[in-house]
Amino acid sequence: MSQSNNVTDLARANIRALTPYMSARRLGGNGDVWLNANEYPLGTEYQLTTQTFNRYPECQPKHVIERYAAYAGLPPEQVLVSRGADEGIELLIRAFCEPGQDAILFCPPTYGMYAVSAETFGVERRTVPAQADWQLDLPAIANNLEQVKVIYVCSPNNPTGNLINPADLQAVLALAQGRAIVAIDEAYIEFCPQASVSNWLKDYPNLVILRTLSKAFALAGLRCGFTLANSDIIQLLLKVIAPYPLSTPVADIAAQALSPKGIEQMRQRVSEVRANRAWLQSALQDCACVEQVFTSESNYLLVRFTASSSVFKVLWDQGIILRDQNKQPGLANCLRITIGTRQECERVIAALAPLAGIDNSNNIDNQSKTHSQTSSIRKGTI
């Protein structure tokens, strides 16, 4: 075996070649309006009710599991809590995929951690691009299931914001029966709870649902997520999860967030986000630099601009940080905008107003009239 003075040569080849997931915080920025990570814009306050920090925590804190189970309408044995839904993504790969042999499948454009998690564990990443309307390409999925052990489907999908057709989800579950786990990522389901498939668990033994407290519960900094599945899958995941996945303070705050009061506060936040989303969507459609605003069932909007790189920089320079989606398949000139407070949404529109001669009813010149005539043709919402 040859020796090297470079310690990085000792690392696995796939890790040396890996491009890490570029989270909003890794990308940085010096803004004061953070609309790039789908976080709730205002902080939440909790007081710790326990001080037993000298003791290791439970692997699965009973009060957290029981409260989330009650919230989800499931028995506690069908719930697992982890360090965010991201850990749930990894646990499925660790439990079901043989490195160098098995594959996961996902349908871009979608959440980037499915790919990164698979690559980290030496598992093949197989992609079946979504159709033009961002729904699943069922024939292509059926033709790509060889050696696939986990299929990830995000609904509402990040970053597009659309729900996946329930009939298509059922079709995928049927295709994968006896072959693969189907993990439905419901990180944003609180913004459209009627679309949850949690009541399907009794009918599909290969169904897994991923949830989080990071979005509607406004606890992104807590890192607390949940995996919902039949008890035999939960027992497998308990074999590969860390012995103490949740710290005592995290479990304490999570339990408070899942109390009746905490759930009511979450629903109030959802109502506010929906109202601000509707306002921002309407205002964006009046912007001359906007080509298309895509309908969203979540706490963000995907927007196609005439020149997204310029728009991104203009807003960045004004302290408004968005998420660039240009590198995602089919999302050229698209930026994702988290729904912030009404004031933050108004700042976005104010920053966009001067770009490409946005129509201004208080200052209509010939140029703005031209934009007004063409915008109704060019702009749309789907």
From Swiss-Prot:
Residues 363-382 are annotated as: Disordered. It is an enzyme of class 2 (transferase). It catalyses: L-histidinol phosphate + 2-oxoglutarate = 3-(imidazol-4-yl)-2-oxopropyl phosphate + L-glutamate. Its EC number is 2.6.1.9. GO terms for molecular function: histidinol-phosphate transaminase activity; pyridoxal phosphate binding. Keywords: Amino-acid biosynthesis, Aminotransferase, Histidine biosynthesis, Pyridoxal phosphate, Transferase. The keyword Cytoplasm does not apply. Homodimer. Belongs to the class-II pyridoxal-phosphate-dependent aminotransferase family. Histidinol-phosphate aminotransferase subfamily. This is Histidinol-phosphate aminotransferase. It comes from Yersinia pseudotuberculosis serotype O:3 (strain YPIII). The gene is hisC.
